[in-house]
């Protein structure tokens, strides 16, 4: 793969650490800023909101810029946001800094996906996107545990200082390595972009993304209590088991990209079907420790195997004007799916349903996503 692609991977790594490391620091943040854990947890929701809002807005505002300039500017925003997190004097300031940081997230991955596909031959486009997203999976496997450890040892602010340093390094390598001829989309104005987004085929792609990832996060949000209360693991075992999940993310991401290069429609349906099967098997399988560990890894693999295929699919449906915006909005759709899935899983639990049944209920999401995808494919053949 071309060297500039790994510059995008570095940016993805920094963004991934910044997004997820807060989950392991909520106790420390809450104690330092004088808020409850529940209130500190809203920093996660605030970030997701920033992604959903920032993806379309920043993509439209920077639509006429050369894509290299967009990527460098986004990493500057990301770095400034993390610096503001490290210096935040209050909870409100930290929330504002988290939202600022998140604004760059969706547009970086959206524009980065377009740039990545332009660096390789047509038959390797999905694999190129998968390589960029390897930064996100590496963040979960290596960056988040390391960032959590730094926060526990030296304070949560030290973690954000570290992520700021990663942002500076990513900005530099992107500025040096990404070619200057990474041009903006050929479009007249933002209205043309919006017409692309409103195409039925693009909207159905976005709905497929939302539904697929809602299934993942309806379960992953509650993976710790599933492992301890259903699987019978001690709390000390949760972190090592999550490393298995992270390994699954890496494997699934690369596999999904390679399969999508060979047969995109079959990969989309197949990965969503695999995700639904894993979720359904988790309900009986989590009652035995070996199968619980295996299924946790498979959840990561099946969930992230959908990412590159869904991203390249929306790019193919939005070919030409509006491609960057469609790609960025699809990243926002992943985050919307995360939020919907977490809400749905919590709703099931709140209604008194056994915790072990949540994965089975979550399987409804990828099953529905398959139906939407098949409808989209059928429309495309007409």
Segment roles from a protein language model:
Residues 266-310:
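C-terminal transmembrane helical hairpin of 12-TM major facilitator-type secondary transporters
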């Amino acid at each position: 793969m071309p060297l500039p692609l790994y510059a995008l991977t570095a940016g993805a790594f920094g963004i991934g650490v910044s997004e997820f490391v807060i989950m392991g620091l909520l106790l420390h943040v809450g104690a330092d800023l004088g808020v409850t854990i529940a209130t500190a947890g809203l920093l996660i929701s605030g970030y997701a909101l920033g992604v959903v809002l920032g993806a379309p807005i920043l993509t439209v505002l920077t639509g006429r810029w050369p894509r290299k300039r967009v990527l460098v500017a986004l990493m500057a925003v990301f770095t400034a946001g993390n610096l503001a997190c490290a210096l935040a004097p209050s909870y409100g300031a930290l929330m504002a800094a988290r939202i600022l940081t998140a604004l760059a997230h969706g547009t970086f991955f959206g524009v980065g996906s377009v740039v990545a596909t332009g660096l390789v031959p047509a038959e390797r486009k999905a694999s190129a996107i998968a390589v960029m997203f390897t930064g996100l999976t590496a963040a979960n496997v290596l960056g988040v545990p390391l960032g959590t450890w730094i926060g526990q040892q030296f304070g949560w602010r030290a973690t954000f200082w570290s992520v700021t340093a990663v942002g500076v390094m990513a900005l530099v390598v992107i500025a040096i390595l990404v070619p200057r001829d990474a041009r903006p989309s050929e479009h007249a104005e933002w209205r043309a972009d919006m017409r692309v987004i409103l195409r039925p085929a693009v909207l159905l792609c976005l709905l497929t993304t939302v539904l697929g990832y809602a299934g993942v996060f309806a379960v992953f949000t509650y993976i710790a209590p599933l492992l301890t209360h259903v699987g019978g693991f001690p709390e000390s075992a949760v972190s090592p088991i999550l490393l298995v999940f992270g390994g699954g993310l890496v494997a699934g991401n690369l596999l999904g990209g390679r399969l999508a290069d060979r047969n995109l429609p079959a990969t989309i349906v197949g990965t969503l079907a695999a995700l639904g099967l894993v979720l359904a098997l988790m309900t009986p399988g989590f009652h035995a420790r070996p199968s619980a560990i295996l299924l946790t890894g498979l959840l990561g693999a099946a969930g992230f195997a959908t990412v590159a295929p869904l991203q390249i699919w929306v790019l193919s449906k939005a070919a030409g004007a509006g491609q960057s915006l469609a790609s960025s909005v699809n990243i926002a759709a992943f985050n919307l799916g995360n939020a919907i899935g977490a809400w749905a899983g919590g709703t099931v639990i709140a209604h008194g349903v056994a915790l072990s049944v949540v994965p089975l209920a979550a399987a409804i999401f990828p099953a529905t996503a398959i139906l939407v995808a098949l409808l989209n494919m059928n429309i495309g053949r007409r």
